[in-house]
Regions:
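Walker A/P-loop nucleotide-binding motif
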Residues: 1-11
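Conserved P-loop NTPase "ATPase switch" module shared by AAA+ and STAND
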Residues: 23-67, 84-86
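Sensor-1/coupling segment of RecA-like P-loop NTPase cores
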Residues: 55-97, 104-108, 112-115
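Conserved small helical "lid"/interfacial subdomain of P-loop NTPases
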Residues: 105-154, 164
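The conserved phosphate-sensing helix
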Residues: 150-177
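Winged-helix-like regulatory helical subdomains adjacent to P-loop NTPase cores
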Residues: 170, 174-250
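Short amphipathic alpha-helical interaction segments
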Residues: 245-261, 266, 277
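Short, amphipathic alpha-helical interaction segments positioned at domain boundaries
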Residues: 278-300
Length: 300
């Protein structure tokens, strides 16, 4: 699935509901040592779920042997039956490691109608229609009614959201929330009525904020770090020197620059990831520099 969409959590819930065995990824030591013990202990006699395949390899000469062995056993049926979850960027890389086609499913990208239903589902507890207006002009951008079926046809705002996010609902929702305001912004325009309609609530949408910018100095090096973070679904900082042609001190400097620019940062699990604010512009830059992209960024 696309980054931020919660595919791993969904598979965890699925495993609990159907009594499947949850398989944890190998440790970093096991990955680098190509320790087959992780695979030898596989629960082949029961349904299993591996929700995070992206955590089972490293883009390193010694970090892909274990995933090759995994695919070999999987294709031969020696691992039994199970469900595998994988980040879309990692999957793009792994398809180069193991080019034999494997059946894969992904959620359909969110288009404008689906985004409308998503926004409606988040607003249901208010039990009031919501009128979203432009924070400067006061013009209605979109009105969300009581019924999820009463979605506006060809709404330009939702169509643009779907296109900008490439169907990633987490990205679309982040951008939407980032623009929300409780009060309109000062404007010289006249004739707009800022008052709430009877029975509805008004919220304001500001212009899309400026994107974070990749530092111009050592630009290619920063892009290599960002791409590596995407391919692995996030990484601990200590692993970067093993995956990139830079010493530890330089990797730490690059991460500090990316963090300062709002492009990446550490999560609660200690792994560094591309930030939500930076995901879209980073993907655009990587596309322009001919980096390997996931299916969603290549499409269209």
């Amino acid at each position: 699935g696309q980054p931020g969409t919660g595919m791993g959590q969904a598979l965890d819930i699925l495993a609990g509901r159907y009594g499947a065995t949850r398989v944890s990824p190998p440790s970093i030591r096991q990955i680098l040592a190509a320790d087959s013990g992780w695979l030898d202990d596989w629960p082949t006699d029961s349904l299993w779920v591996l929700p995070d395949l992206e955590a089972c390899f490293l883009r390193h000469v010694q970090g892909i042997s274990i995933i090759r062995d995994f695919f070999d056993r999987l294709a031969s049926g020696r691992l039994g039956k199970g469900i595998i979850g994988c980040d879309s960027w990692a999957w793009a890389y792994l398809q180069m490691i193991w080019p034999v086609p494997l059946p894969a499913l992904t959620l359909q990208p969110f288009d404008a109608p689906r985004l409308y239903r998503l926004l409606h589902s988040l607003l249901l507890p208010t039990a009031r229609p919501v009128d979203f207006r432009h924070a400067v002009t006061g013009k209605t951008v979109i009105a969300i009614s009581d019924s999820p079926e009463q979605q506006p046809a060809d709404n330009a705002e939702l169509i643009n959201m779907a296109a900008q996010s490439r169907g990633n609902p987490a990205q679309a929702l982040y951008q939407w929330r980032n623009r929300l305001r409780t009060e309109p912004e000062p404007s010289d325009e006249k004739g707009q009525d800022p008052k709430e309609s009877a029975g509805s609530k008004t919220l304001w949408l500001a212009d899309t904020p400026d994107d974070p910018v990749v530092p111009s100095s050592s630009r290619e090096e920063h892009l290599l770090v960002l791409h590596t973070l995407l391919l692995h679904g996030g990484l601990e900082a200590t692993l970067l020197p093993q995956l990139l042609p830079f010493p530890d001190s330089h990797c730490q400097w690059l991460l500090a620059r990316l963090h300062q620019a709002g492009l990446a940062g550490p999560g609660r699990d200690g792994k560094w990831r591309v930030s939500e604010a930076a995901y879209r512009p980073v993907c655009q830059i990587l596309r322009g520099h001919q980096f390997l992209l996931d299916h969603f960024q290549r499409a269209g």
